[in-house]
Amino acid sequence: MTAPKPVVLCILDGWGLDPDGPANAPLLADTPVMDRLMATCPNATLTTFGPDVGLPSGQMGNSEVGHTNIGAGRVVAMDLGQIDLAIEDGSFARNPALTGFIDRLKSSGGTAHLMGVASDGGVHGHTDHIIAAAKAVAGAGVPVVLHAITDGRDVAPKSADRFMPALEAALPEGARIGTVIGRYYAMDRDNRWDRVARAFVAMVRAQGETAESAQAAVAAAYGRGETDEFIAPTVIGGYAGMRDGDGIFCLNFRADRAREILRAMAQPDFDAFDPAGLPDFAAKLGMVSYSDEHDGWFDIVFPKREIVNTLGAWVAKQGLRQFRLAETEKYPHVTFFLNGGQETPETGEDRFMPDSPKVATYDLQPEMSAEEVSDSFVAAIEAGYDLIVVNYANPDMVGHTGDLEAAKAACTAVDTGLGRALAALEVAGGAMIVTADHGNCETMIDPETGGTHTAHTLNPVPVILVGGPEGATLAPGRLADLAPTILHLMHLPQPVEMTGRSLIR
């Protein structure tokens, strides 16, 4: 029996299952295609959080973690747990990259500028890491200025008024907060350089809103109607900006939302906006590798670990062709993260990236670029690829806005595109796995507070088999089981490094 062609992995980013949950966008939306698939096709559920995806117990999953595990076909120990352990056992403070950073600033007489997301969300960073780094650097006699990036997306929308007092109280002598900036500005990943420029100007030139303390900055932002994600870049107290001989240390451990602001800080020929005032840094340090290019500009505390024989690499070794597709908001996930942190495409791997719409927030255009993604999806099915991996960003990106009606529209847009792709797949004689990397839009109201819920969830996600072997069923599992399942459908052997198991029974 010949393998179906193409075999498709369709990831509905942020589409979880929560039958009892309030404000469940997928259930409330008009989604006839997904309704039909769940009623007529083999389906099961996947776990996307905690140790099943290489995270600490109870830690919610995210798109980086999800796509890394999906592509690896094994549980990958993620950076959050590795960093936590290093702080606990004391090896973080002794790390040669960190001690080298400290030594260079001692020699230059400069200040260490620490920047990172100031919440306990654990998706991009963690306040515990900020505090540990500040203690290590200030404890060595180097003055520390913290550029605190408020979250409001992976935690409650208005929780900085809780995080900031605790953070200020925990900072050691010799460390203070210099700026407070919403992640909307400091952690953009879709080339909204006007936003990044405002964060840059506050950090580098000490220009922006002003407040006497971080707590006052948050209170003023709330008075302006801003939630944590959108806090306007604010300069704290007498912070006067960066100077020659200073150092920069980015504490975020997830790459995609750190790249742009760090590019502005370090790229020699940066021209997305005028980087006037950028000092001659004595040292530049990153918690992790942010990209191959960034590795040329920053020393790294925790270098990336090679993941051998990912799904993409293994399919390429069989001489087969594959296609990766997502709009720009999720493009790194179906390429860089799915390929185990490798930037360069595999042999025979083609990619396409429609631009995400240029709107302030995606509730204003919940369809995002789903139609363009669907156009390319259908074309790829018709083009004869062996493997197609596509990500629909809408359920996650619109779910993060907390707008239920917009999230329902997002789900409907994705459902429509999925229907078009399935029609083309039936003609081609292919097979598809429909799933998600984590939950989000199925819980739009916080069941504990009754307020808006904008974060990811611990809910299971669906996994659906379309066009599989006759009589097949699916077993429940975890994200690491998806690559083995895809290889099963493609009639390919599973590399020994993949310890996941096919879900097909």
From Swiss-Prot:
Disulfide bonds: none
NCBIfam families associated with the record: pgm_bpd_ind (TIGR01307)
One biological process term in Gene Ontology: glucose catabolic process
Keywords (A to Z) from UniProt: Glycolysis, Isomerase, Manganese, Metal-binding
Pathway given in the UniProt record: Carbohydrate degradation; glycolysis; pyruvate from D-glyceraldehyde 3-phosphate: step 3/5
GO cellular component: cytosol
Enzyme class, spelled out: isomerase
Function, as annotated: Catalyzes the interconversion of 2-phosphoglycerate and 3-phosphoglycerate.
Entry-linked SUPFAM superfamilies: 2,3-Bisphosphoglycerate-independent phosphoglycerate mutase, substrate-binding domain, Alkaline phosphatase-like
Protein name in the entry: 2,3-bisphosphoglycerate-independent phosphoglycerate mutase
InterPro entries hit by this protein: Alkaline_phosphatase_core_sf, BPG-indep_PGM_N, Metalloenzyme, PGAM_B_sf, Pgm_bpd_ind
Subunit field text: Monomer.
Cofactor(s), names only, from the UniProt record: Mn(2+)
Positions with a binding annotation for Mn(2+) 2: 13, 63, 437-438
Entry's EC annotation: 5.4.2.12
UniProt: substrate binding residues: 124, 153-154, 183, 189, 254-257, 330
Lineage, highest ranks first: Bacteria, Pseudomonadati, Pseudomonadota, Alphaproteobacteria, Rhodobacterales
Keyword Metal-binding included in the entry's annotation: yes
